[in-house]
Design a protein with these regions (language model features):
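Cleaved targeting-peptide boundary
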Residues: 19-27
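N-terminal signal peptide c-region/cleavage motif recognized by signal peptidases
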Residues: 14-16
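Short aromatic-glycine-enriched beta-strand elements
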Residues: 44-54
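Short nucleic-acid-contacting surface segments enriched for D/E, G, S/T with interspersed K/R
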Residues: 76-92
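Extended, charge-rich, solvent-exposed interface segments
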Residues: 116-134
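Short, structured beta-strand/loop micro-motifs enriched in basic residues and often containing a Trp
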Residues: 67-76
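Conserved hydrophobic positions within beta-strands
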Residues: 36-38
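OB-fold/S1-family single-stranded nucleic acid-binding modules
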Residues: 97-122
């Protein structure tokens, strides 16, 4: 009986964990680039969020929210809590939500006006931070 309960819970919770980490809500075949003003960097787990206000093609303000990596994942890519200043101009590259009515995306990277780029999940090999070779 105990082994059946353990099996049930393992199967049940593995589905929940998989759903949480699913990227099904995002169009992974499409990239969008949003230029705007950084209004929030939500530095928290399980995912950090970058919030940018941009102007749409009709001249209306649009607030975009981009889901990033965990804090540890961002730090491995060179991010810190103070990598950006609220109010600075940035360009965000992301995978859009499959629902075009949603101003929400999966973050690829953020580029500052200086040209410095911060990657969320992965980065080109030539720009990877050096690792201690001990």
């Amino acid at each position: 009986m105990n082994s059946k309960c353990v099996l049930f819970f393992c199967l049940f919770f593995s589905g929940i964990a998989n759903a949480h980490h699913s990227r099904a809500a995002f169009d992974l075949e499409t990239n969008i680039e949003i230029e705007g003003t950084l209004v929030e960097l939500a530095w928290r787990n399980p995912h950090a969020y970058v919030v940018v206000e941009s102007i749409d093609e009709k001249g209306n303000p649009v607030v975009w929210t981009f889901e990033g990596h965990s804090i540890a994942g961002l730090m491995r890519n060179g991010w810190t809590r103070s990598s950006f200043e609220i109010g600075e101009r940035v360009v965000v590259d992301a995978r859009p939500n499959r629902d075009p009515e949603q101003s929400f995306g999966l973050l690829n990277y953020v580029t500052r006006a200086s040209g410095e780029t911060f990657y969320a999940f992965s980065q080109p090999q030539e720009s990877a931070p050096p690792h201690d070779a001990r």
